[in-house]
């Protein structure tokens, strides 16, 4: 896993920002309810967060299958980087559950490609 939050916070620090003053927003994404993976994803998240994954990974009844909270992992990483929890807004909308509102790669199961876009202004 690449550390995009770490790079972004590092860049903001180089521009004079203090991590505790940075605001972050995590938009709609596949939710904990729907992001089923094999063991490689939980292992990567565990490495990325230095083992701090409590509440972010749940083993499913199927052997070798897990549910992973990507938005929760991203929020956890931002907190590790020094952002204040109250400065992190997290959408609760799951792109898989709301596939009629958002494009979802998982929902199309390898069908037509799609994309989403976010705009950030300073």
Give the ranges of each region predicted by the language model.
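Active-site microenvironment for binding and transforming phosphate-containing groups
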Residues: 1-122
């Amino acid at each position: 896993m690449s550390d995009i939050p770490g790079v972004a916070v590092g860049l903001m620090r180089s521009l004079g920002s203090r991590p505790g003053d940075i605001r972050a927003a995590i938009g709609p994404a596949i939710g904990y309810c729907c992001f089923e993976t094999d063991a490689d994803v939980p292992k990567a998240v565990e490495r990325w967060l230095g083992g701090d994954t409590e509440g972010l990974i749940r083993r499913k009844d199927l052997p070798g299958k897990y549910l992973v909270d990507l938005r929760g992992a991203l929020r956890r990483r931002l907190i590790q980087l020094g952002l204040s929890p109250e400065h992190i807004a997290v959408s609760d909308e799951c792109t898989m559950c709301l596939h009629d509102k958002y494009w979802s790669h998982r929902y199309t199961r390898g069908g037509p490609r799609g994309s989403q876009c976010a705009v950030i202004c300073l």
